[in-house]
């Protein structure tokens, strides 16, 4: 059986390509339960892709003849471990204080981009929690990311769990200024979905480094501190795009407004896509 999948331009990550967590969440919707999605190439935006089932419970996503991603259920995976909890006050206190925000390499990103307006991007800006190997950020879902029942759509939860783990992993190893990271693989388990207006927070923690591969975990906490979802991710270090996109000013505590709106007009990604294709092929299930 074949289905069609399109990633709208709003949900970009690196310039001209889909945000990895959002793309993984859209793909995971074709399967039940915890799912592992492996990204083989950057997902194009506003372009129909084909979703193919293999008859054994796995799926492949293709853009023409190019393999974009593979996904499979992860029923045997152990419960995703959450390394500590963070209060909403703690998350607010550290928001935007990560080293990444001194010079973010993807300011147009739907999740962590400083160049996205409230109601357009998720604006999740994690910072390190003092004395703990944890990064945290507050997140209050807006009405644009919920379903008809008022609950956050699952792919938005995947997206929210994506960038914080990458920022935690990159900052923990002291990623050089000439490097960036790209999501290669993500496994997520969703227990409950928050509602629009819920004062949530996202936490993340680094795991380990293996050459150019970094692994990290993340979790979404509800207003009462309950774990709503958790994920683990593998990231690959790549050369930073050259020239880097322009970066707007970003204060220590993210403002409610003041960043330019995302217009959908993005830099030419051709050089970057070639790099991503080469690097993401190294992630294997």
What feature does the model see in each segment?
Residues 123-191:
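A mid-sequence, solvent-exposed acidic-amphipathic segment
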Residues 180-254:
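Accessory, usually C-terminal, subdomains that scaffold auxiliary metal cofactors
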Residues 1-4, 56-151, 253-273, 281-285:
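Non-catalytic linker/capping segments at the edges of enzyme domains
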Residues 53-59, 212-215:
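A short, compositionally biased
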Residues 9-13, 145-146:
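Short hinge/gating elements
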Residues 36, 58-62, 217-219:
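Residue-level detector of beta-strand face positions
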Residues 11, 15-18, 23-50, 54-55, ...:
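Hydrophobic beta-strand-centered segment that forms part of the acyl-chain substrate-binding groove
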């Amino acid at each position: 059986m074949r289905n069609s999948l399109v990633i709208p331009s709003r949900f970009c990550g690196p310039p001209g390509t889909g945000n990895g967590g959002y793309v993984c969440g859209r793909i995971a919707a074709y399967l039940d339960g915890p799912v592992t999605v492996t990204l083989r190439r950057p997902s194009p935006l506003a372009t129909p892709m084909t979703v193919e089932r293999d008859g054994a419970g796995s799926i492949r996503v293709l853009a023409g003849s190019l393999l974009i991603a593979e996904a499979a259920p992860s029923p045997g995976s152990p419960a995703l471990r959450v390394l500590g909890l963070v209060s909403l006050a703690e998350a607010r206190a550290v928001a935007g204080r990560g080293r990444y925000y001194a010079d973010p390499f993807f300011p147009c990103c739907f999740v962590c981009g400083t160049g996205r307006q409230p109601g357009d991007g998720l604006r999740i800006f994690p910072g390190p929690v003092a004395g703990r190997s944890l990064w945290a950020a507050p997140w209050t879902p807006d009405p644009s990311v919920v379903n008809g029942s008022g609950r956050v759509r699952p792919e938005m939860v995947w997206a929210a769990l994506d960038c914080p783990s990458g920022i935690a992993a990159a900052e923990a190893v002291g990623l050089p200024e000439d490097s960036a990271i790209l999501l290669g693989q993500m496994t997520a388990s969703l227990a409950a979905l928050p509602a629009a207006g819920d004062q949530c927070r996202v936490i993340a923690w680094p795991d380990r480094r293996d050459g150019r591969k970094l692994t990290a975990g993340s979790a979404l906490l509800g207003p009462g501190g309950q774990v709503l979802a958790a994920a683990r991710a593998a990231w690959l270090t790549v050369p930073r795009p050259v020239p880097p996109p322009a970066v707007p000013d970003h204060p220590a505590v993210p403002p409610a407004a003041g960043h330019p709106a995302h217009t959908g007009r993005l830099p030419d990604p051709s050089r970057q896509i070639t790099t991503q294709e080469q690097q993401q092929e190294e992630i294997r299930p």
